[in-house]
Amino acid sequence: MKKKLFIFSNENINAQEGKFYCNNVDLKSTPEGLNKKFDVNLFGRKVSKNAAHEIKIKRINIFTNIFSYISSVIESTKEKNAKYLIISITPYTFIVSIFLRFLGKKPII
């Protein structure tokens, strides 16, 4: 069984017809590469603009505001033996790292 990996990003992600898209090719390739060894869950911000790169992983969560984003972070800490990866430090991801530390988790930044 694969370990869970939660990836937190401030990247804008667009959802169209059940598929997810982003403009940053790194945000596309990193989760897809890690998906071979981990059960990846990607967290990002929702945007209505069209994006270029389709993200081909199963578990993607997008949020419209910081409160729903934080509540999902808290919910994710209930998973045992999970790893947490924060891609780039921004106000959103900095707050995520603080919450993870308060809840006894050690994120990889």
Cite the ranges covered by each PLM segment.
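Glycine-rich phosphate-binding loop signature in dinucleotide/nucleotide-binding domains
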Residues: 77-82
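Amphipathic coiled-coil/heptad-repeat helices and related helical stalk/stem segments
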Residues: 26-27, 69, 92-93
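N-terminal subdomain of nucleotide-sugar transferases
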Residues: 1-49
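A short acidic (Asp/Glu
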Residues: 18, 53, 95-98
